């Protein structure tokens, strides 16, 4: 797969609306600001990333505190293992008011919401941001979420994706119920809209029956941008059908290259152009004014800030499996992977990176020591070298940058790394488009 010399990478900020980033020790970092319950905190993050010309910032979400480990939320609450998760529609509205160009994405579950609710939420966001909305499609991961939404247990892995396919069919159908020129707004004739250009959907599936039409007209982007992060075989097929930006968790470049090729092939098999779908691995950047400073910061992240129990709390949440009674030296077998209903692909990718023999301690270390994606360490020039190797080596189309602390990690990326990427012609120095789709180079449906 050859690349144009003028091709530039995409950069996306991976955000959390709570007290910790995805790195569970981040709240203990000496530079972390504990202002996650203040609107100014999120608005500042939006301004920082927009100043760095990031394509988008999107927020992860879950519908429950981590409570699988030991059958209690106590460890998550005590150790700060992501117990706080604010309502993202409110957070994005606050950021939208102080930014003009950066894309704004939120995570909504196809298992615990309805198509009409999600379609209306993101259509509204797309209008009120001038075409900057994106939906990160997830199927949710565990029983704790089910129990907050009126169910006893979470759907099994494949059933969640069957439901998600119908959810997307209905949601996309609702976005298409208004034609682009349906609004007339003719004061003289008294004609608000053309009823021949507003259509009922009448979706009738196994999981959903949705009449429509949507109560929000066609949006500036036509449809909000769709993100997805499935990495199991079923998840990759789902992404091949629906996703426009695929968020991956590949820990090493060889795993990433294999994933990139496999996913692009699946996209082509769906009759879609692989060039219109971007694959972005989550990456941590540990930046310093010198290599030695960056390595000392990395040592602190690896050795000082993460409680091993917090890692097991988050691992239990992701896998929907209580690991509190297992020893760290116990093997992670094929049978164990098949028995869980949570995120299987994450474990499979890590096993491919480390080797077939994988223990629970390896997985706990994976969550604790920042191995969910690549970890780029060094000066701005050195980190740019590492990112360029991935980007030019058929491993990705850009990166989703996760923070080791906030907001400082993003401030450092914008100050130390982005100018290097811009000088090399690898990243934009201004926004040329007026919508998120235009800035990502994606077609308007």
Residue spans for each PLM region:
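N-terminal glycine-rich cofactor-binding segment that shapes the pocket for flavin-like pterin cofactors
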Residues: 1-445
């Amino acid at each position: 797969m050859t690349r144009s010399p003028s091709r530039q990478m995409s950069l996306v900020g991976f955000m959390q609306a709570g007290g910790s980033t995805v790195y569970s020790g981040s709240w203990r970092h000496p530079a972390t600001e504990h202002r996650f319950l203040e609107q100014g905190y999120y608005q500042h993050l939006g301004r920082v990333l927009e100043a760095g010309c990031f394509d988008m910032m999107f927020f992860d979400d879950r519908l429950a505190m981590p409570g699988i480990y030991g059958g209690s939320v106590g460890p998550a609450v005590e150790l700060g293992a992501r117990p706080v998760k604010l309502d993202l529609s409110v957070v994005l509205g606050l950021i939208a008011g102080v930014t003009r160009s950066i894309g704004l994405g939120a995570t909504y579950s196809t298992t615990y919401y309805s198509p009409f609710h999600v379609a209306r939420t993101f259509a509204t966001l797309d209008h009120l941001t001038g075409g900057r909305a994106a939906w990160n499609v997830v199927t949710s991961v565990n029983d704790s979420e089910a129990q907050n939404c009126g169910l006893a247990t979470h759907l099994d892995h494949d059933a969640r994706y069957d439901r998600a396919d119908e959810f997307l069919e209905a949601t996309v159908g609702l976005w298409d119920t208004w034609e682009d020129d349906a609004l007339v707004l003719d004061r003289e004739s008294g004609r608000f809209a053309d009823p021949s250009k507003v259509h009922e959907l009448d979706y009738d599936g196994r999981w959903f029956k949705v009449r429509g039409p949507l109560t929000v007209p066609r949006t500036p982007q036509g449809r909000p941008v769709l993100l997805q992060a499935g990495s199991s075989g079923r998840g990759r097929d789902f992404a091949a059908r629906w996703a426009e930006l695929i968020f991956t968790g590949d820990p090493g470049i060889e795993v990433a290259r294999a994933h990139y090729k496999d996913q692009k092939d699946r996209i082509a098999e769906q009759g879609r152009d692989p060039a219109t779908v971007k694959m972005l691995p989550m990456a941590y950047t540990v930046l310093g004014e010198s290599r030695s400073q960056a390595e000392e910061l990395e040592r602190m992240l690896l050795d000082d800030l993460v409680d091993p129990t917090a890692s097991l709390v988050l691992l239990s949440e992701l896998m929907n499996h209580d690991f509190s009674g297992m020893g760290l030296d116990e093997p992670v077998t094929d049978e164990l992977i098949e028995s869980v209903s949570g995120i299987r692909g994450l474990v499979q990718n890590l096993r491919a990176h480390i080797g077939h023999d994988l223990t629970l301690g390896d997985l706990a270390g994976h969550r604790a020591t920042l191995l969910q994606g690549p970890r780029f360490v060094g000066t701005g020039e050195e980190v740019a070298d590492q990112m360029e190797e991935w980007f030019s080596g058929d491993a990705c189309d850009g990166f989703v940058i996760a923070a080791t602390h906030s907001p400082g990690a993003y401030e450092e990326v914008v100050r130390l790394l982005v100018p290097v990427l811009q000088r090399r012609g690898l990243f934009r120095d201004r926004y040329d488009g007026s919508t998120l789709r235009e800035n990502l180079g994606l077609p308007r449906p």
